[in-house]
Amino acid sequence: MFNHETAGYPDFTEWPNARKSSTHQTQYYRWLERAWMGGLRLVVQHATTNSIICDMVVGNAVQATRYSCNDMVAVDRIIDETYAMERYIDAQNGGPGTGFFRVVTTPEQAREVIGAGQMAVILGIEDRRGGI
């Protein structure tokens, strides 16, 4: 399921490691769950990308290209993975709609999800041009 280690303190087996993953933000669902259990109810999940940096690190052989450096291809992939994480969290909690993590698309949905005690996740996009 995961392409990197998720253990943090005290081992730090995989992160932080800027040389290996300078363009990759990690977000393990258990870390979000811990924040939700502590009372966090609203999160903005930015699909953040920068094709210039991606092209530079690939061109200088700092990192191999795993996916396209095209901004919108990367944004679509990040959004798809956010929905996949929602489905995964639901599956861990009994099925569709049962997890703490809910992607919302309207203020009304956010209020409903927060009122139900779940975490409302707003999708955003930020690219090298400063946003879309």
What role is predicted for each listed range?
Residues 1-132:
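N-terminal hydrophobic targeting/anchoring segments and the immediately downstream early-domain regions
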